[in-house]
């Protein structure tokens, strides 16, 4: 890594006035740059892990920019294991931008996305699973997602991966010893090797089982509410969100565009799309809304087909069902205060049916239960989720599994020991990719490019 000193704003920049903003420096010149910018009244000592009070100034003109605090963390006792300085100034957009510009004028370089965490990884402060956990924690959209990400930051995924990799290394050492010193050692216990590989493979499979949960926690679900006009789609959205998110009237075609809202159900972030009522219409604007409704439903992870119990199942409902029946679908029978669900006839192939009285906020908890059952995540509880692997980690685990299967095949086919070692090394390399012990620069670039600038 180049011996440069980097700088970035570490707090969110929003148009509203914030109370505090943080600008972070890391690198060999962090302290010297900070001393160009920070004036401390009195005789405050520049010591590691101490907070100093003073004024931040332009390095060239000595014009005062802001009044604030400075936090000094000297290597190796810092996030990056380099000298780190943080300016804690007033929030908002102007003050932090001026402090950052002053850092750059004094010799710092603007940090790339994730560069602070990349340096922490390269300097041995974090392994790769912990670094990815940092990104997931920053981007978490639910408490469960945050807790699963925190488990990654704490190394709860890296620990079993390292243990499995070490077991593969131990097995490889046993096999290679027989290749190099066959006459000096007892015969290899092939049954024992097979049993060990099977156990490692099973453990990898158990870790892989968290991949779908991890994907749900990170990316969530998109749920589209569809149906004919005036069946209560917007009322359902408002009841679900507990606010007047969508306009509700008795006039068909009130909703002309897709209305979005964000919710969390059982720890899963959900984007809810309230769509325009789907019907044949000569109104050009409404027709655009109908087209967008179709597009939203086709791209959704789950469709809530909503019907009016007082009207019953119509030919239009049947057409909508046929259009979206290949997608995960829940039937919402709304307005059951007018006609009980038992009197409504609908296709028997629909497995999930929920009764609601959206105008009275009834049936929402049953709807959320049905959603969790549909995506098979009833057990998705933060307390039971030690970690949640991402797609990159899952791909590496699958590579390791395939390599172990090849070794087992070589044993079964009585192939020479040299064949065993090739795939054992493949499994070891794949597991090393997860923790970063065996990783390419291009993969690192791809991982850290999704970080925010100041992390």
From Swiss-Prot:
Q: Which residues bind GTP?
A: 230-235, 249-255, 274-277
Which keywords annotate this record? Cytoplasm, GTP-binding, Hydrolase, Magnesium, Metal-binding, Nucleotide-binding, Potassium, tRNA processing
Instruction: Recite the UniProt cofactor note for this protein.
Output: Binds 1 potassium ion per subunit.
The TrmE-type G domain, residue ranges: 220-376
Residues annotated to bind Mg(2+): 234, 255
Entry-linked PANTHER family? TRNA MODIFICATION GTPASE GTPBP3 (PTHR42714), TRNA MODIFICATION GTPASE GTPBP3, MITOCHONDRIAL (PTHR42714:SF2)
Q: What is this protein called?
A: tRNA modification GTPase MnmE
Identify the taxonomic lineage of the organism of origin: Bacteria, Bacillati, Cyanobacteriota, Cyanophyceae, Acaryochloridales
* Gene name of the record: mnmE
